[in-house]
């Protein structure tokens, strides 16, 4: 898998595009947690487009921006970096940290158990 890395501002913009499906610069500005100038948002979108993560299409007098790379692919790349940097390459240690989170509901834990059971069935 090609490593995908987003600096914080670009990650926030990508998160908005993943959530909304598509957005104009104004839509992204409105969805941001912190107010940002129109030109700053436009610059972030243009940078993401140059990197091949976003594309745009005309939409009236504006442009609609779309994520080209999916959240799952970007998330997999980010998790691989976290696993290597923080958990010394151990998926088991990373998983143990995740399931020790007391904020996980019983339903979430049950779904995780089901995912593990399916994955175990796939192994020869």
Label the model's feature ranges.
Residues 17-21, 98:
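Short helix-to-turn junction characteristic of helix-turn-helix DNA-binding domains
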Residues 42-46:
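Short, hydrophobic-biased segments on the C-terminal half of alpha helices
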Residues 3-9, 59-78:
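Short, cationic-aromatic polyanion-contact patches
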Residues 55-56:
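Short beta-strand "wing" residues that participate in macromolecule-binding interfaces
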Residues 22-32:
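Short acidic, hydrophobic short linear motifs in intrinsically disordered regions
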Residues 52:
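Glycine-centered, phosphate/nucleic-acid-interacting loop/turn motifs that mediate DNA/RNA or nucleotide
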Residues 76-121:
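Amphipathic alpha-helical dimerization/coiled-coil segments
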Residues 1-14, 122:
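Short alpha-helical segments that sit at the start of domains
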């Amino acid at each position: 898998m090609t490593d995908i890395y987003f600096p914080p501002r670009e990650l926030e913009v990508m998160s908005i595009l993943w959530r909304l499906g598509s957005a104009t610069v104004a839509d992204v500005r409105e969805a941001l947690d912190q107010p940002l100038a129109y030109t700053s948002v436009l610059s972030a979108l243009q940078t993401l487009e140059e990197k091949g993560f976003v594309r745009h299409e005309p939409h009236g007098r504006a442009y609609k921006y779309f994520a080209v790379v999916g959240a799952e692919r970007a998330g997999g790349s980010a998790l691989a970096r976290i696993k290597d940097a923080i958990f010394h390459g151990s998926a088991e240690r990373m998983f143990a940290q995740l399931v020790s989170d007391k904020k996980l509901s019983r339903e979430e834990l049950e779904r995780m158990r089901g995912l593990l059971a399916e994955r175990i069935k796939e192994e020869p």
